[in-house]
Amino acid sequence: QSRSSAASDVYKRQILDDVVTKAGTSREAAGLEDDTVRTFVKHAAFLQLVRGRRLRLQRTEPNIGALATALADPVNPVTAQYHLAFVASDTFYEHTHRYPGQRHDWQADVDPLLSHAQTYCARIGLDLSDSDRVRLQHACYELTRGAHSDTPSTAAYLGGVAAQEVIKILTVQYIPLDNTCVYDGIVQAVSSFRL
């Protein structure tokens, strides 16, 4: 055994002793074996505690910084405007009891949807640049044109994303998405926001 390996083993044993001491139990009672400790120490740098937010807080107290950063991202395709359009779509539904675009004259719903989106942005204190306003208007147009429907390929893709998240949680091996994921099927862009 090399000198560094022996030092590493001493370090691992010390960590184990510290853990069981803090837990108020003995190593034998805890049933911790050297291999378990070795694996834990090896992967400890990748541990992450994920504390999600309640979905209700997305609307009432969203993370404005995350939205502003997502809208201003110079590298990745911007998808945050679709989140704002979806929030406005829910408000539209609350007022009209239908989703935008579900009537024959669907284009008449674009401006009211955009108005709901702009009202929401003003209420939460999100300042939109001119380019943000243009992207939001386009997102409201596309959402209205789609009339609250989806294509089979989009549904299949989102089903795959959901299945992947379930696998992450069940296997406890990967960090799951935290809070909001937006998929733009037109430009094939996916963004995740912690709102």
Regions found by a protein language model. Give the residues of each.
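C-terminal, well-structured subdomains that either form a transmembrane helix-short loop-helix hairpin
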Residues: 101-109, 116-190
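Long, low-complexity, polar/charged, intrinsically disordered or flexibly structured peripheral segments
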Residues: 9-137
